[in-house]
C-alpha cells in the first residue's frame, strides 16, 4: 500500500491529537478515518467497536493504522500477530519523530519454544492452540478471557468449563500431546494449561535445541517465555485434570 501525502497528513494530525497515547484508525477508500482507542494499556490500541462498524459501513477497510508515541515504526510482536489475524496491511506512524512504515501480512508466527508472553495472544492456552494446529493438525477454538480472570470466584472457570467444547475428555495417564490443567499458585480457578511431551522433545514445525527427559512438558507461565522442562513434583501436585483430544488417536 502506498501512503499519499494526504493520508500521511491526516494520520500525523491524529497522532498529535492523541499524544502521548496511541492513535488508531483505518483507511477506507483512500481516506483515513480516525477512531477512538479504548485500550486500557497505554502502549496498545483497541479500536472502539462503534467506530469500526461505522468505518466498515463506508467501504472495505484497506489498512489498519496506529501510532507509536515516543517510539519507532518498528512493529511489536503483538503488531506482527495482529497483522496475520486481520490479513490486512498495518500502518505504523512514529511520533513526534515522524516516520511511516507499512507492513503487509507475511505469514509471521511466534515459535512454540521461546515466545514472549502476551495475554490472550501468547499465553498458556494460545500455546496449546498453536501446538495442536502445527504439530497435530487439530484446530482448537479460542475463548475470550481477561487477564486475572482466575482470581474472581464468580467468574466462569474458563479452562474447566470449556474443555469438553474444545473436544477434550479426561484420562488417567498422560500421553504425547495431552493437555494438563493446573492451578498456579492458589487461585479461585485452575488457570494454567501445559502440553505433555513425554520423551518426545523435538517439534515437527520448528527447529529446537535438544531437551533430555522422559517426562517433558511444554508450557508458558504468566509473564514468562514458553519453555520445555521436566514434569516434576512442582507440577504434578498442581495438576487437576489430564485431558486428551478426541482427534489425537487419528494423528
Which residue stretches match the model-derived regions?
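Short acidic alpha-helical/loop segments enriched in Asp/Glu that coordinate divalent cations
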Residues: 138-149
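Conserved beta-strand-loop surface patch within small alpha/beta domains used
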Residues: 1-63, 69-107
Amino acid at each position: 500500500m502506498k501512503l499519499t501525502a494526504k493520508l500521511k497528513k491526516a494520520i500525523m494530525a491524529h497522532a498529535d491529537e492523541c499524544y502521548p497515547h496511541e492513535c488508531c484508525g483505518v483507511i477506507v477508500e483512500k481516506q483515513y478515518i480516525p477512531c477512538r482507542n479504548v485500550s486500557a494499556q497505554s502502549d496498545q490500541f483497541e479500536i472502539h467497536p462503534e467506530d469500526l462498524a461505522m468505518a466498515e459501513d463506508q467501504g472495505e477497510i484497506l489498512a489498519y493504522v496506529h501510532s507509536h508515541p515516543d517510539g519507532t515504526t518498528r512493529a511489536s510482536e503483538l503488531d506482527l500477530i495482529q497483522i496475520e489475524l486481520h490479513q490486512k496491511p498495518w500502518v505504523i506512524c512514529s511520533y513526534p519523530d515522524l516516520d511511516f512504515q507499512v507492513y503487509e501480512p507475511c505469514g509471521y508466527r511466534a515459535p512454540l519454544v521461546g515466545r514472549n508472553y502476551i495475554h490472550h495472544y501468547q499465553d498458556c492456552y494460545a500455546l496449546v492452540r498453536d501446538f495442536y494446529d502445527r504439530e497435530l493438525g487439530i484446530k482448537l477454538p479460542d475463548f475470550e478471557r481477561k487477564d486475572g480472570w482466575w482470581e474472581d470466584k464468580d467468574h466462569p472457570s474458563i479452562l474447566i468449563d470449556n474443555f469438553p467444547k474444545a473436544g477434550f475428555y479426561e484420562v488417567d495417564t498422560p500421553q504425547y500431546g495431552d493437555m494438563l490443567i493446573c492451578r498456579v499458585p492458589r487461585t479461585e480457578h485452575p488457570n494454567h494449561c501445559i502440553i505433555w511431551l513425554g520423551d518426545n522433545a523435538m517439534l515437527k514445525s520448528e527447529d529446537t535445541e535438544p531437551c533430555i527427559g522422559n517426562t517433558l512438558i511444554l508450557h508458558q507461565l504468566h509473564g514468562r517465555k514458553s519453555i520445555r522442562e521436566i514434569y516434576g513434583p512442582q507440577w504434578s501436585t498442581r495438576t487437576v485434570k489430564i485431558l486428551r483430544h478426541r482427534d489425537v488417536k487419528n494423528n
